[in-house]
């Protein structure tokens, strides 16, 4: 775990308190855990070139690990209020120094910050929370990831069907972390029977959860429309903050969902990958944001593959097919910098 010597109070400053932000009455704009960076980029490439035969380099899981602090730094420059880490398996994090060093990197400017854990054991989760407590504002329990591996290991969305385990995990973190301002939140999907979801939310509220993020789809749903009406119903049945998540691609959509559901914030994943300046009101990625990414990624030592793939995703909708073909084939940082300078100079827009 790398923290650049962060003071133990840096993420508990009053002006950075997420709970207070959610109670402000203003839209809180949240960057999601981004657990599927590499899958999204793989999909991007297959969609962009589906009619052409191309070679796609294998995607490494290190893409998430090596770019996450840099990406959080970028979106914070463009009106993102709160960032999550990618999902970290609590058991590995607790048992392995190597896992901690590779999975969690932060710095003094990286706050407010929520560390999201995949967990199925209350003691291990609370151990993990104790480790990150000095460096983050809180932890989040992933109860919404529908990926097969996660559910097979007892993590993610299967937990919405294990309410007693979720309650125990929340309770143990609350009991063992002494800092009263350290938040404990959960991220869930909805049940087919919404009454079960509302019951779960009421129970975790009574146990002391700080807020709940609701992805408005069931475990089985992938590309179906998001059930914003279900999110609204959940919000109307609890008193704690609720964050809406699912298919938000612009600031206007974020504001519409916020107003439609009556929630306290919105969480965005894919929309921010495509346009990290989305929360600042940009409809497309401005060139300034691209150059900001270049500066941040190079300063933080982001490996080329991660650096390049983020740019590919940011520029996918604002470059032509021919430009994509050339840019995506670049194989060095210097080549990327030369391409950006030659084609776009330092203009503020594409």
Locate the predicted segments by residue.
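Active-site beta->alpha loop and helix N-cap motifs at the rims of alpha/beta catalytic domains
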Residues: 110-184, 189-197, 205
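Glycine-rich, positively charged N-terminal anion/phosphate-binding segment
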Residues: 6-19, 36-52, 63-132
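Active-site-adjacent beta->alpha loops and helix N-cap segments on the catalytic face
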Residues: 91-102, 147-172, 176-177, 193-195, ...
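Active-site beta-loop-alpha junctions enriched in small/polar residues
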Residues: 34-36, 63-65, 88-90, 118-120, ...
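Catalytic beta/alpha-barrel core
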Residues: 75, 161-163, 213-223, 244-246
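Alpha/beta catalytic cores of nucleotide-metabolism and tRNA/nucleoside-modifying enzymes
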Residues: 1-35, 41, 47-65, 69-70, ...
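Non-cysteine beta-strand/loop elements that form the S-adenosyl-L-methionine
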Residues: 85, 138-146, 206-216, 266-273
């Amino acid at each position: 775990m790398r923290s650049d010597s962060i003071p133990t109070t840096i993420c508990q400053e009053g002006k950075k308190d997420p709970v207070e932000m959610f109670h402000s009455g203003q839209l809180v704009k949240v960057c999601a855990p981004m657990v599927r960076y590499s899958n999204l980029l793989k999909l991007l490439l297959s969609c962009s070139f589906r009619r052409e035969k191309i070679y796609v380099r294998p995607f490494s899981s290190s893409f998430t690990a090596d770019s996450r602090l840099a990406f959080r730094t970028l979106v914070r420059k463009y009106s993102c209020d709160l960032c999550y880490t990618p999902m970290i398996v609590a058991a590995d994090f607790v048992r392995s120094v190597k896992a901690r060093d590779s999975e969690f990197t932060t710095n003094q400017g990286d706050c407010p910050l929520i560390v999201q854990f995949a967990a199925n054991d209350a003691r291990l989760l609370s151990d993990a929370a104790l480790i990150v407590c000095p460096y983050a504002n809180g932890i989040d329990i992933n109860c919404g990831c529908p990926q097969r591996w996660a559910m097979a290991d007892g993590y993610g969305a299967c937990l919405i069907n294990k309410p007693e385990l979720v309650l125990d995990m929340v309770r143990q973190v609350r009991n063992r972390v002494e800092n009263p301002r350290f938040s404990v939140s959960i991220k869930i999907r909805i049940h087919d029977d919404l009454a079960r979801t509302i019951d779960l939310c009421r129970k975790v509220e009574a146990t002391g959860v700080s807020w709940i993020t609701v992805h408005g789809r069931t475990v089985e749903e992938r590309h179906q429309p998001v059930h914003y009406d279900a999110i609204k119903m959940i919000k109307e049945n609890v008193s704690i903050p609720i964050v809406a998540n699912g298919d938000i691609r612009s600031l206007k959509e974020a504001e519409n969902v916020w107003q439609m559901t009556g929630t306290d914030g919105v969480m965005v994943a894919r929309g921010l990958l495509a346009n990290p300046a989305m929360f600042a009101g940009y409809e497309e990625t401005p060139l300034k944001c691209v150059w900001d990414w270049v500066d941040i990624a190079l300063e933080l030592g982001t490996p080329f593959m991660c650096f390049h793939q983020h740019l590919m995703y940011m520029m996918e909708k604002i470059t032509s097919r021919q430009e994509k073909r050339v840019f995506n084939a670049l194989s060095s940082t210097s080549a990327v910098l030369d391409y950006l300078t030659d084609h776009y100079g330092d203009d503020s827009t594409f």
